[in-house]
Amino acid sequence: MNKTITALAIMMASFAANASVLPETPVPFKSGTGAIDNDTVYIGLGSAGTAWYKLDTQAKDKKWTALAAFPGGPRDQATSAFIDGNLYVFGGIGKNSEGLTQVFNDVHKYNPKTNSWVKLMSHAPMGMAGHVTFVHNGKAYVTGGVNQNIFNGYFEDLNEAGKDSTAIDKINAHYFDKKAEDYFFNKFLLSFDPSTQQWSYAGESPWYGTAGAAVVNKGDKTWLINGEAKPGLRTDAVFELDFTGNNLKWNKLAPVSSPDGVAGGFAGISNDSLIFAGGAGFKGSRENYQNGKNYAHEGLKKSYSTDIHLWHNGKWDKSGELSQGRAYGVSLPWNNSLLIIGGETAGGKAVTDSVLITVKDNKVTVQN
């Protein structure tokens, strides 16, 4: 069926009713990570636990195949990237040997030829959770994410509180009732060279770090879209990293999903059109924060966006809608489109389906 998007009265989005984009994931899948290499999609972790799966998108009989389990334990919010035929997995949130929830700063490598994992003797100089990862000129770049010490301390306090609800309420109030700058989200840009397994300083944002941003890159440019400015408070900011020439430049583009912004959204490119879709946030939190309420999302219900935005002539236009709001899935480039795998919908429910967003002549097509 075709559906005209009347908001802004500019563009049209059509919802394809034919066969599913990809087979359903083997388990409901959210808060995991994924990558694509030579038309083969790899997904894992998050609600899949330590499981990883692959799917050959060019196969006549498309199906998910289980891979060797991840050796680092179940993790949420890890990131991954393919470099020179190997899959690298960065950080994430999980439990340590003592059973405490913590942020990791380690790196694991998966070899598709041998279906085997190895933990590298390499540690990022800071924790990696809520961060983004992208590849440029054979290196992985990481930026954003929560502060490892603050985040780990929060969960240590919760562990000590046990089932004491009064203590838990006090810990939560103490944790959330701070200004954004007091969470020290990572604004550094780090590079990881797989040939040496060394981390290097590559620059830093002139503004602030975010957690749960959407990321997409093409050529010498990378875009970081929305994300958290602090726990429970999103931003509508859009940052552009330009690697053209010898000097990295940071640019701030027009905002999107204003005024509250979202985290866990999806970003991609189709026919040179920059796409941003979905995400989750708390409506009214930005106003609360501006009015001096640091615990900005207290009492607010998380909402899930259906909006699809396109970057056009220096601004964002709402150009389509998802069939339902979703966030915290995996977004990948495929068939000159944005492929979304899994995610969560209202109430935090993990899903198993995929969505393909294609843009042609400023017309958005959504295939479910």
Curated annotation (Swiss-Prot):
Keyword Phosphoprotein: no
Cellular-component GO terms for this entry: outer membrane-bounded periplasmic space
Alphabetical keyword list: Carbohydrate metabolism, Isomerase, Kelch repeat, Periplasm, Repeat, Signal
First and last residue of the signal peptide: 1-19
Pfam families according to UniProt: NANM (PF24996)
SUPFAM superfamilies referenced in this protein's UniProt entry, alphabetically: Kelch motif (SSF117281)
Effect seen on changing residue 344 to A: No effect on catalytic activity
Gene Ontology MF terms: protein homodimerization activity; racemase and epimerase activity, acting on carbohydrates and derivatives
Effect of residue 302 to A: No effect on catalytic activity
Keyword flag Aminoacyl-tRNA synthetase: no
Enzyme Commission number(s) of this protein: 5.1.3.24
Localization per Swiss-Prot or TrEMBL: Periplasm
Known catalytic reactions: N-acetyl-alpha-neuraminate = N-acetyl-beta-neuraminate
Upregulating conditions: Induced by N-acetylneuraminate and modulated by N-acetylglucosamine, via the NanR and NagC regulators.
Major enzyme class: isomerase
Impact noted for substituting residue 30 to A: No effect on catalytic activity
Extent of the Kelch repeats: 40-84, 86-137, 139-173, 174-219, 222-265, 287-336, 338-367
GO biological process, one term: N-acetylneuraminate catabolic process
Result when mutating residue 328 to A: No effect on catalytic activity
Role according to the record: Converts alpha-N-acetylneuranimic acid (Neu5Ac) to the beta-anomer, accelerating the equilibrium between the alpha- and beta-anomers. Probably facilitates sialidase-negative bacteria to compete successfully for limited amounts of extracellular Neu5Ac, which is likely taken up in the beta-anomer. In addition, the rapid removal of sialic acid from solution might be advantageous to the bacterium to damp down host responses. Forms linear aceneuramate during interconversion of Neu5Ac anomers.
Quaternary structure, from the entry: Homodimer.
Family statement drawn from the similarity comment of this UniProt entry: Belongs to the NanM family.
The protein's name in its UniProt record: N-acetylneuraminate epimerase
Lineage per the UniProt record: Bacteria, Pseudomonadati, Pseudomonadota, Gammaproteobacteria, Enterobacterales
Gene: nanM
